[in-house]
Amino acid sequence: DTACSSSLVSVHMACQSLRAGESDLAVAGGVNLNLFPEEFISRSLAGMVSPTGRCRAFDAKADGYVIGEGCGAVILKRHSDALRSGDNILAVIKGSAVNNKGHSYKRTGYTGQSQQALRKKARKEGGAEPGNAGYVAANGTGSYLGDPIELKAIKNVLGQGNPSERSTCWISSVKTNIGHLEGAAGIASLIKAVLALQHEGIPRHLHINELNPQVSLDDSRLAIAVERQPWPRSGKSRLAGVSAFGLGGANAHVILEDAPSPVPRPGKVDRP
């Protein structure tokens, strides 16, 4: 249990198990149900929930998160095994990482240095070049103080990119679409990123009119996806980063890559 990063941490742990040969198939995910009014009351009294009922992640008027319900799960196998079995591969996990900065964590603000270290660790593991990232499924909760810290961390790691290739890297948060699923938030972001790869388009980030004044993206290759953005397949792999940060300081980051083109399989022949 790492709070809001739990489901993405489960994906990371499943990947470790597969790499170590402890398992051949894993199901990772999370679920969040709000069954008791005390959950709403406590979060409201703590000033965590948006009084307007809108998650305005990265917006100048961000005022808290919106509680959501949902569940999600993914089936994971080693890439070589999935290819050999002829499975329908939706995406490839190129790298993943987890870290913890609980001793310096504050409820209203994440630690930017730990986020940068986390993203660099995941990219180093997967051998992913920062300039190849085309999409970031950010944590983006709607925190006026926490959101710009995350954007600055993303900018420091991905903002400059490869000098010879400065294609835009789009940012959005699934919490503006379906609310904050807390323990299941990470898997929701992961599934959204997989769908973006599959459908060759980055979904629109909602409820943003003006970027939080504490951060600027003008001098970087980063941009908020205020409209749906086409993300077609090209000659090189497309990469997406997925982040989830837990209330106690446990952070998780997963890097996704294009699924390989499906190999045509001979159809069944009707026999008389």
Task: Show the residue positions of the predicted features.
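Condensing-enzyme catalytic core of the thiolase-fold
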Residues: D1-P272
